UniProtKB/Swiss-Prot annotation:
Organism domain of life: Bacteria
GO molecular function terms listed in the Swiss-Prot or TrEMBL record: structural constituent of ribosome
PANTHER family documented for this protein: LARGE RIBOSOMAL SUBUNIT PROTEIN UL30M, MITOCHONDRIAL RIBOSOMAL PROTEIN L30
GO cellular component term of the entry, any: cytosolic large ribosomal subunit
UniProt entry tagged with the keyword Ribosomal protein: yes
Protein name listed in UniProt: Large ribosomal subunit protein uL30
Similarity-based family: Belongs to the universal ribosomal protein uL30 family.
GO aspect biological process, one term: translation
Length: 58
């Protein structure tokens, strides 16, 4: 499978608890951090849930 790089571009402050847990599950705990994951349906679903807080880096 292909991999995607995900970068946190907005702060989690003020976000609902479920979105904070999603960021934790993705491995994003600080602003401007980049993590790499395989492009599975579960990862893409998590990215879609917090799409206003993250960006896909190419």
């Amino acid at each position: 499978m292909s991999t995607i790089k995900i970068k946190q571009v907005k702060s989690r402050i003020g976000a609902p608890a479920d979105q904070k847990r999603t960021l934790d599950a993705l491995g994003l705990r600080k602003l401007n951090r980049v993590v790499e994951h395989e492009s599975t349906s579960s990862i893409l679903g998590m990215v879609d849930k917090v799409k206003h807080l993250v960006a896909i880096v190419k």
